[in-house]
């Protein structure tokens, strides 16, 4: 058994939403978490900048002798996961979008109207839509960017009227105009406001990729042990 730690990284605090699921389902695993709070948010930065930051962090994690890198950041996963795999072929590198897309495609019924919310970079990449519809073309996918969410969450502005009003600003028209029945939290920061979203839109089915990725991590560990 490989007892080395698993490396997680994100642009800031968002990737921490994966950790409780890891501790519950894979309690024997050690974790190194790198949150780039000095340079957050990534969601409005240029692709080359995101790629450069991600290479630096992955290099740090590889030098820390991790056995796997988990990109607990949708923006990075949408931008440069393949670049990271080419740069560091010696260890598995797992992005968060593919496991989430697989789960969405497999669990949502035909004709479901699925809304993806995320950063500007994630949404403009179309990564979720492509990955989901490649597996289940009968699903209707709609996407919208919510760029103010991450800065507010990083500042701890969560359980108050400011966050609720911001959620409604981005999501009211999006949900109504597209008749959305399912929302995918396409940024690992967004589980911090999942309770807000569920309270404001009680009829929505909410899918949280931060809880889904653990199953794929387990599969990779089992394959390599």
What are the residue ranges of the model-derived segments?
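Non-catalytic structural scaffold of enzyme domains
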Residues: 1-225
